Curated annotation (Swiss-Prot):
Location within or outside the cell: Cell inner membrane
Reaction(s) this enzyme catalyzes, per UniProt: glutathione(out) + ATP + H2O = glutathione(in) + ADP + phosphate + H(+)
Family label: Belongs to the ABC transporter superfamily. Glutathione importer (TC 3.A.1.5.11) family.
Any single GO CC term annotated in Swiss-Prot or TrEMBL for this entry: plasma membrane
Chain positions recorded as ATP binding sites: 49-56, 357-364
Main location: membrane
Protein name as it appears in the record: Glutathione import ATP-binding protein GsiA
């Protein structure tokens, strides 16, 4: 049945009265209620709202992926204009017909790339599969196009990456592979569910530009699901604000930012961390928690003077971590990824040291090496005066009670067969810290501290949104009262209101228990708020380290200045000028086996502030 007359000529998508529910304990739980919106050709519609507000399930309903998960979807109208200009009713399509629609006419970039990529196929095979299926290309043609797409999303050594598996890539790299896969068939509608959450600010700027370029070329409609209001200001034409499964406000990006009508929209905008808000301040400060009823009311910020003088709790010297790459008929190691090269730093009790840098710069590998989750080839790691890089596995388990890790991908770090209560209680049982009833009470307390309900303990990971899963991982890391927490992008998946609550919780625990944080992040506004000191990493080496105020207010290294310049501004009229060109090459940290890389020499430029001298300013700016 043709539907061309039902869809306005300029629209590529129209949704009327979308209702989504899930069955739980024989009860119907509404996730989305009476949602209606349209999308014009070449337009970007940003859907914003809290974690659990219904943003992602709306996208999954459009892709017809909810039926398999037991979702109940009802909709008066769900019309899509295909690339062929035919208009179809999505709810009327069979499973076989939808396979031809997904990827070709409507593509989706998922929030968690590790769980969206097939672990048993190489990156090249997965991108080429979509191209072969929808463009009738040969295997050779598809692989050539796959390499071109990896080049477009700024992945260095694209030819090498084609033959790698997802687990061999960083989180940001995996996200870029997902973006390349979604864009490879030039769909009529692109649904991007938090596509830049795992990306650093410079790559984020390039990906946003890439989506804009392809959108203009193909007159592609884009639905951009995000909690980053800076990204919304930069990319959106219209904004749809969701709260508890309903649309509470919609309008142009200028209307939403300059004249928000709904209290929740005003609260959402007021909670956005602004780069430069800590100017003139030496210590971390809590985020003001803004209520829905009183969006303009802010509690006075409290300075966090928590650093304990004396010996550092963690001392790292000349840490080296490399990964072998095999090639040739004999599958010999011919090259190595120099992930971490001679990295040194100290961490004091009660201090937050933030590691920042681009995806693939070695931030996460540094954190994993400290817990021996990856083996290092050189250097010393000393915790509480004891060298831990040479400990036996038995002694290492006891150490992990004092050093906990919050992983970047929450779904991959939670056991899908265990309830989240069992996942949180597991470390308490392993280390024999609390008896049964006390452990259960501890789980309930932890869930409440991270903004969840105690009864959530009986649910499974797939029943939560991405942001809620990240809060569960934070609760599990806090269960043992560790001395050091390594937080790898711990708040990147959270919306601004929950992010503020979690960071305030981390600061409170730091004040109460003297916990030291190694905070790995690409969100410069959050780093500015939470950090005592900041270390900037580039190609596996620290190129600038110092007090947070010195690094942010007086950045000395050109790469640090580049990172700060790339931060999106949550103001549509103050859009950042595009400084990073998609045609530029990213340097590679892959070298021949045995080849040594010159270690950077840090020079003191102020109290505790050390900077490497770049060989070429142009190499870091890449304008």
């Amino acid at each position: 049945m043709p539907h061309s007359d039902e869809l306005d000529a300029g629209n590529v998508l129209a949704v009327e009265n979308l209702n989504i529910a899930f069955m739980q304990d024989q009860q119907k739980i509404a996730a989305v209620r009476n949602l209606s919106f349209s999308l014009q050709r070449g337009e970007t519609l940003a859907i914003v709202g809290e974690s659990g507000s219904g943003k992602s399930v709306t996208a999954l309903a459009l892709m017809r992926l909810l039926e398999q998960a037991g979702g109940l979807v009802q909709c008066d109208k769900m019309l899509l204009r295909r690339r062929s200009r035919d208009v179809i009713e999505l709810s009327e399509q069979s499973a076989a017909q939808m396979r031809h629609v997904r990827g070709a006419d409507m593509a989706m970039i998922f929030q968690e790339p590790m769980t969206s990529l097939n672990p048993v196929f190489t990156v090249g095979e997965q991108i080429a599969e979509s191209i072969r299926l929808h463009q009738n290309a040969s295997r050779e043609e598809a692989m050539v196009e796959a390499k071109r797409m990896l080049d477009q999303v700024r992945i260095p050594e694209a030819q090498t990456i084609l033959s790698r598996y997802p687990h061999q890539l960083s989180g940001g790299m995996r996200q870029r592979v997902m973006i390349a896969m979604a864009l490879s068939c030039r769909p009529a509608v692109l649904i991007a569910d938090e596509p830049t959450t795992a990306l650093d600010v410079t790559i984020q700027a390039q990906i946003l530009q890439l989506i804009k370029v392809l959108q203009k070329e193909m007159s592609m409609g884009v639905i951009f699901i995000t909690h980053d209001m800076g990204v919304v200001a930069e990319i959106a034409d219209r904004v749809l604000v969701m709260y508890q499964g309903e649309a509470v406000e919609t309008g142009t990006v200028e209307q939403i930012f300059h004249a928000p009508q709904h209290p929740y929209t005003r609260a959402l905008l007021a909670a956005v961390p602004q780069l430069g808000a800590m100017k003139g301040l030496d210590y971390p400060r809590r985020f003001p928690l803004i209520s829905l009823e009183h969006p303009a009311k802010q509690a006075p910020p409290i300075e966090q003077k928590t650093v304990v003088d004396g010996e550092p709790v963690l001392r790292v010297r000349n840490l080296v971590t490399r990964f072998p790459l095999r090639s040739g008929l004999l599958n010999r190691v011919t090259r190595e990824v120099h992930a971490v090269e001679k990295v040194s730093f100290d961490l004091w009790p009660g201090e937050t040291l933030s590691l920042v840098g681009e995806s693939g710069s070695g931030k996460s590998t540094t954190g994993r090496a400290l817990l021996r989750l990856v083996e290092s080839q050189g250097g010393e790691i000393i915790f509480n005066g004891q060298r831990i890089d040479t400990l036996s596995p038995g002694k290492l388990q006891a150490l992990r009670r004092d050093i906990q890790f919050i992983f970047q991908d929450p779904y991959a770090s939670l056991d899908p067969r265990q309830t989240i209560g069992d996942s949180i209680i597991e470390p308490l049982r392993v280390h024999g810290l609390l008896p049964g009833k006390e452990a259960v009470a501890r789980v309930a307390w932890l869930l409440e501290r991270v903004g969840l309900l105690p009864e959530h303990a009986w649910r499974y990971p797939h029943e939560f949104s991405g942001g809620q899963r990240q809060r569960i991982c934070i609760a599990r890391a806090l269960a043992l009262n560790p001395k050091v927490i390594i937080a790898d992008e711990a708040v990147s998946a959270l919306d601004v209101s929950i992010r503020g609550q979690i960071i305030n919780l981390l600061l409170d625990l730091q004040r109460d228990f003297g916990i030291a944080y190694l905070f790995i992040s690409h969100d410069m506004a959050v780093v500015e708020r939470i950090s005592h000191r900041v270390a900037v990493m580039y190609l596996g080496q620290i190129v600038e380290i110092g007090p947070r105020r010195a690094v942010f207010e007086n950045p000395q290294h050109p790469y640090t200045r580049k990172l700060l310049a790339a931060v999106p501004v949550a103001e549509p009229s103050r859009q950042r000028p595009q400084r990073v060109l998609l045609s530029d090459d990213l340097p590679s940290n892959i070298h021949l086996r045995g080849e040594e890389v010159a270690a950077v020499s840090l020079q003191c430029v102020g109290p505790g502030h050390y900077v490497a001298q770049p060989q070429s300013e142009y190499a870091f700016m890449r304008r």
